[in-house]
Every structure is written in C-alpha cells, then in structure tokens.
Amino acid sequence: MTFGEKLLNAASTRGRLCVGIDPHESLLTSWGLPVNVDGLAEFSRACVEAFADTVALVKPQVAFYERFGSAGFAILEETIQTLRERGCLVVSDAKRGDIGSTMAGYASAWLDPASPLSSDAVTVSPYLGFHSLDPVFELAEQHGRGVFVLAATSNPEARELQDQQNADGVSISQQIVDQAAALNAPYMAQGKAGNIGVVIGATLSKPPRLSTLGGAILMPGVGAQGGTASDVDEIAGDMAHLAFPNVSRSILATGPDIAEMKNSVAKTAADFPGFPRS
C-alpha cells in the first residue's frame, strides 16, 4: 500500500491533521522542564501520550533532537517507534537533501525498515536538483513510505527563490509540484494516492497549482501563523482530501497537561475532517 493510501485511511478515522513535536528551548522552559536530555525525554513522552491515539500524522522536528547528540537521537528513536507501534503515522522533519550515495544514506536512515529511525515519511529539500532525491523516492516506492518535498514553504524568505520562473514562465515551486505529480501519476491513474507529497504553506497568496499532484500535501502555517481551514481548502482545491495542515505551536502551548493537549487536538482536527474509505 502506498503512503498516500495509508494516510487517507488514517485520516478517515482521525482527521486530516499533522501535529508537530517541536521541543525547542523556550517551549521546554514554558513547560517547566530542564533544557537538557531529561527535559527532551519528558516532553517527547507527553506528546506521545497526547497524540499517538488521536492524530493521523505526527511530525517530530529532528533538529531539536539532533542538538543533544546521540542521547537526543536515542529519544527520537523511542518517540518514532512508540508512535508507530500505537498506530500513528510519523513524518520525520529532517529536510535532508544531497546527491548520490550520500542521499542514499539519508534515505536508508529515515525510510529503511531496518533503521532505528525508520519513519513512515521524511521531509526533503530538492534544491540540488529534483532528481538528486531519486534514492529516497526509490526507497519510498520499495517500502510504501512517504516523501514530502519542500515546494512552496510558508517562510517569507522563500519567495525570492521559490517564486523564480523559468523561460516558460513556470515557477520553481510549480516545477517541483509537477515533477512530484509525474512520480504519482501511475497511482493516480488507478484512483490511488502515491508516495510523493509536497510542502505548501497555508499562508501563500500565490501557491502552485496542485490539481494533478496525486499525493499528500503537508501545509504549515495554520493556527499561530494565521492560516485557516478555508485557506487550506482554497489552496488544495481538488486535492483537499490529501491536504494535511501542520499545527504545532497552538497545541503544544496547552502542554504539559496531556488532557489539555488532547482537547486542543480534537478542536483543531474538527476543522479538517477526513473522508470515509470504501
């Protein structure tokens, strides 16, 4: 089964919501936790308890674990494994991008079932060339895992690069979406969602066209950054059933109380229902 189909199945019962686990320093402090490995572990375990049984897709931000070295990665491994064991899909927000054997190494780290960091999906950067990512696409195809390619991100600095156009007037972000769509096309022809998704900001005024993508759309910018459910639907259009807004700040702000975080998830997810699956 493709990652896209797994995600649609999860959304049918849990809604189309992606919740981030972002244990940055100020959030650890606001939770009353020490800014060290112990605080990281406690934060992560609370998030697992709040999200594992309620959210379709959870997105740990790898950088906040990586900063603590091997001990941080050990906590990330535990977090990913526990979430997946409890039926939650996990996208590791690693934003990896390289070429050749190095990209193959990143692909194995995040998508190979034998890896201790094995996740359902990973975020990647295409700016060494879209097909520099072929090793991760190939491993995703082999194991039914997902890849989210940065296409049109929500940070304002991105516009000067991602909105640039080629000689035919096609923006870089649109070219990325179109190349992802080409990889998903065989599945879309069968009425299925493919393995290759894109990252599209929910606050963009001129987003790329997504009507032929045929894969999942990860949409940061909802909630604290100002994006709304109507923004998600307008940008995603015919692909709205595959649009998964990423909400982190507003939900994590209700922690460390697990019940409060669960309530926040439920309220937010109500704006992004899934669709029944036959």
Curated annotation (Swiss-Prot):
- Keyword line: Decarboxylase, Lyase, Pyrimidine biosynthesis
Kindly state a single biological-process term from the GO annotations of this entry: 'de novo' UMP biosynthetic process
| Record EC number | 4.1.1.23
Pfam short name (any one): OMPdecase
One MF term in the entry's GO annotations: orotidine-5'-phosphate decarboxylase activity
Instruction: Identify the pathway.
Output: Pyrimidine metabolism; UMP biosynthesis via de novo pathway; UMP from orotate: step 2/2
- The catalytic residues are K95 (proton donor)
Top-level class of the enzyme under EC nomenclature: lyase
- Matching InterPro entries: Aldolase_TIM, OMPdecase_AS, OMPdecase_type-2, OMPdeCOase_dom, RibuloseP-bd_barrel
Q: Which family does it belong to?
A: Belongs to the OMP decarboxylase family. Type 2 subfamily.
What PANTHER family is this protein classified in? OROTIDINE 5'-PHOSPHATE DECARBOXYLASE (PTHR43375:SF1)
**What is the name of this protein?**
Orotidine 5'-phosphate decarboxylase
Q: Name the source organism.
A: Corynebacterium glutamicum (strain R)
